[in-house]
Curated annotation (Swiss-Prot):
This is Large ribosomal subunit protein bL12. Keywords: Ribonucleoprotein, Ribosomal protein. It comes from Trichormus variabilis (strain ATCC 29413 / PCC 7937). Signal peptide: none annotated. Homodimer. Part of the ribosomal stalk of the 50S ribosomal subunit. Forms a multimeric L10(L12)X complex, where L10 forms an elongated spine to which 2 to 4 L12 dimers bind in a sequential fashion. Binds GTP-bound translation factors. Belongs to the bacterial ribosomal protein bL12 family.
Amino acid sequence: MSAATDQILDQLKSLSLLEAAELVKQIEEAFGVSAAAPVGVAVAAPAAAAAAEPVEEQTEFDVILESVPADKKIAVLKIVREITGLGLKEAKDLVEAAPKAVKEAIAKDAAEDAKKRIEEAGGKVTIK
């Protein structure tokens, strides 16, 4: 910054609150401007933020095992064990407790892959 602007800034820093308010009034009168924030800007900002929220794309998905036909239970159980890394008993409990989340908060590609594998084994799956 130049020496002149540095000097003005130092002088502004040394003003009391009353002197600063008086300076603002003088600047408003001299230049025909207003220091007040426009009301329309304050109201428009939250509306713009609200409009931007629905545009966000979901990044985490849950794979939900909805149902498993009795004759496909073993095949689905094997796939669930591969996907989750659960032991035999835990995977069996999960499959029998359908509808139940198999994987939660995973990427879209991983969720679609898990859904495809479980459906190929005979289970009914949804992604949320």
